[in-house]
Amino acid sequence: MTMKKYRTCESVCKGHPDKLCDIISDSILDACLRKDKSSRVACEVMATKGRIIVAGEITCSKKIDIKRVVRNVLTDVGYNPRKFLVFVHVHQQSKDIAGGVDRAMESREGDTSWYSMLGAGDQGTVYGYA
């Protein structure tokens, strides 16, 4: 007897907390890259009733007004930004991670191939829709 397999998915609207957080983090990344194409952004966003929390590591040569980015997104998706407290807990990328991103271990050990010159802070393959 063959076992049935089911695939499921979830679709949410732009005001849903998961979608809202994705849009905010994407907008923060876009803002950083507009000002500095070499920006490094590892940004997490959490939304709950009346609160948005942005945390992570951002290295950008220009100042980004993260609270303004968050409030613009809230307005764009139909929320009143004045009804939210926005907390930002962001710092620059750690030197340990920057060292791995700036120059791969293989490169530091003498490998001169082009792909060994590329560094990475962390690696993963993900897919999804925001």
Annotate the PLM regions:
Residues M1-A130:
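A domain-level signal for the structural core that forms small-molecule/cofactor-binding pockets
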